[in-house]
Amino acid sequence: MARKNRTPEENARREKIRELLQMANIDSMDDIQTLFKEAIAEFMEKGLEAELDEELGYSKYDYKNKDTDNSRNGHSSKRLRTSFGEVDVSVPRDRKGEFEPQVLKKNQTSISQDIEEKILSMYAKGMTTGDIETHIQEIYGISVSDSTVSRITDKILPVAREWQQRPLESIYAVVFLDAIHYHVRSEGQIVKKAVYIAIGVNLDGRKDVLGMWVGENESAKFWATVLNSLKNRGIEDIFIACTDNLTGFDAAIHATFPQTEIQNCIIHQLRNSSKYVSYKDLKALMADLKAVYAAVDEQAALDALDAFEERWDKKYPKISQSWRANWANLSTFFKYPQEVRRLIYTTNAIEGFNRQLRKVTKAKSVFPTDDSLLKMLYLAMMDITKKWTGRRQDWSLIHAQMAIYFAERMPE
């Protein structure tokens, strides 16, 4: 069986693991087991410190926010039995002796393998505050407050920001750009914010979320900021960008990546076209539009658009006007073979991802802060993209076709 080609991110992660193993002098399974025990101890200690922060109402050394006559009083050591062996955990104390930790109760001397797996899973996935609280209470009988869980899950934010700033590949065959909207509290008001999302397909045909940015309502100006961020992280060229037809979007793209070809999403255009069409006309009108975007080539598509005008312009003149006004970016896909056309003529790749995000976030009608929104989206993204392990089935053919159309820009 041929060895699987790893992505640059997988190779980078493997390199970090190799460095960690070398730094920790890991050369046996016993050493690996010790490393796992230390990881569990580190996680437990972080959770305990976060709980004590919540109990006292201020973080360590944050004396200006201290509003209690209680204080920290060093640490005690507790030995736990785990499936990896015994682990020593440093438990923080308060001077009054009122601190009752819930992550690791005072009389608790062991944690089962199931709890260990759940702790590591929750730490990696960052379940919502309420979900974690309910899960721990119902399954393990441990009660924790919303704010304690929030403090613990907030540990993921630096990880999310590091991910957002990670280096990217120099060339992407296709990048899909779209926004999804949420309500967030800001200065005492509930405001609608856009989360700008970029998904790239690299030259190996592998899909990856390049970034997610929380900003104001969708605008070409903010997209320009997003595109500059992508460039600063290492992207030098994008062959094709797939977008909606937001005003000024193409100018924002070309200001950063002047050679990039733009394909407006046909599905977005169809939605806009059908928005004010009478129900009794809808089926016939959409069939005539299909003759435009499903044509064998651009000339046939223009002929079909002429026929559409003759039939529908008296009743719905703005539809054909919109198609003609946006034709330069709607018709890009006609120059390519069918395999490339299917890849780029809609933004289904990113819309499918957005649907999965909405499933995760649908119970949350309003987010308290931008950070709480980013945290949940990052954790949902990590879970969704676990399944993105392979490349497109027809990628070898697509790559060969792109090597012809983008010969001067394709690396050797």
Which residues does each predicted region cover?
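Short, conserved DNA-binding cores of transcription-related domains
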Residues: 1-106
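Acidic/histidine-rich catalytic cores and adjacent linkers
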Residues: 3, 258, 291-412
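Conserved phosphate/pyrophosphate-binding and hydrolysis machinery centered on Walker-type P-loop NTPases
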Residues: 7-10, 25, 29, 33-42, ...
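Electropositive nucleic-acid engagement tracts
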Residues: 59-67, 127-174
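Basic, short loop/linker segments at the boundary and entry of helix-turn-helix/winged-helix-like folds
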Residues: 67-125, 141-150, 154, 170, ...
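RNase H-like nuclease fold core
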Residues: 86, 90-95, 103-108, 142, ...
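Conserved beta-strand -> loop -> alpha-helix junction used to position metal-binding or nucleic-acid-contacting
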Residues: 240-247, 252-288
